[in-house]
């Protein structure tokens, strides 16, 4: 099940990256 846990970790990473990019975008506008 390592593939499944990797996928969920990766999606969590993408979510946090998107959230960070969103905060930066908010601060820049």
Swiss-Prot record:
Classify the main location: secreted
Look up the record and give one Gene Ontology term from the biological process aspect.
Answer: protein kinase A signaling
Lineage: superkingdom: Eukaryota
Among its keywords, does the record have DNA damage? no
- Tell me the GO molecular function terms: glucagon receptor binding; hormone activity
Q: Return the Pfam families for the record.
A: Hormone_2 (PF00123)
What are the protein's UniProt keywords?
A: Hormone, Secreted
**What GO cellular component entries does it have?**
extracellular space
Give induction info.
Answer: Produced in the A cells of the islets of Langerhans in response to a drop in blood sugar concentration.
List localization entries.
Secreted
Question: Family per UniProt?
Answer: Belongs to the glucagon family.
Function recorded in the entry: Glucagon plays a key role in glucose metabolism and homeostasis. Regulates blood glucose by increasing gluconeogenesis and decreasing glycolysis.
The name under which this protein is listed is Glucagon
